Regions:
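PP2C/PPM-type serine/threonine phosphatase catalytic domain
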Residues: 1-229
């Protein structure tokens, strides 16, 4: 997908992308009919960073001097229990069902079963902000304090990545991450902009060919490029 296409992405486009991912899983069901996966997505648009996620893989936004300024909220049973008041925060830390997720991509051809992602537009972006998309095998081993210290250091991004690799070396879980550092922003005002979270329905409209091509290229890229493993 060309840069100008990403810049014009809309929330509906993201929903269409995820619908296409569901179709891709279904079309490859012969490989593993029970396969499922979490999802994180990020694209730089004219309005800011457009993020989407399903499950407990996370997106962090980290800023030097401020630490973690944004973090996605896991789609998990524990978070549902917290939100309902059924458990207290201290009970959530070591909850026996801490690894149970409530949303994911999975094999189905029933569009009514597609799970809606959480989509957030990050408008508060500063130069040198670091975004990290990662699985629970990373954040389960690396504390927020260590994450902030490493990713906001003055070392080259490659060196910071190697430091994270070292911390995840003994993980028995999937520990994949993609790290992006913001070089500059179009609007350098000091005014804080509010982020926007969207409530997603299930619009059904023809998906643009460029979006389909982008999904295929993304899946091919993920297969060929693995970080922090």
């Amino acid at each position: 997908m060309a840069d100008e296409d990403c810049q014009n992405l809309t929330v509906d486009d993201i929903v269409a992308l995820i619908d296409e991912a569901y179709k891709t899983l279904y079309n490859n069901r012969a490989i593993c009919p029970t396969m499922a996966t979490t999802l994180t997505f990020m694209a730089k648009t004219n309005e800011g960073m457009l993020l989407a996620h399903l499950g407990d893989s996370r997106i962090y936004q980290i800023r030097k001097g401020e630490g973690v300024v944004f973090q996605t909220k896991d789609h998990s049973l524990v978070n549902d229990l917290l939100d309902s008041g059924a458990i207290k925060p201290e009970e959530a830390k070591n909850h026996p069902q801490g690894n149970v997720i409530t949303k994911c991509l999975f094999v189905t051809d029933d569009k009514d079963r597609y799970m809606a992602p959480t989509i957030t537009l990050i408008r508060d972006i500063k130069p040198r902000d670091v975004f990290m998309l990662c699985t629970d095998g990373v954040y389960g081993l690396v504390s927020n304090d260590d994450m902030v210290e490493i990713l906001t250091s003055d070392n080259a991004l490659e060196e910071r990545t190697k430091e994270l690799v070292a911390l995840c070396r003994n993980s028995h879980d999937n520990n994949t991450a993609y790290i992006i550092e913001i070089g500059g922003v179009d609007d350098d005002s000091t005014d804080k902009k509010e982020n926007v979270t969207y409530t997603i329905g299930k619009p059904r409209r023809p998906i643009k060919r460029r979006i389909c091509d982008f999904v295929r290229e993304t899946l091919r890229f993920v297969k060929q490029n693995k970080h922090l493993e």
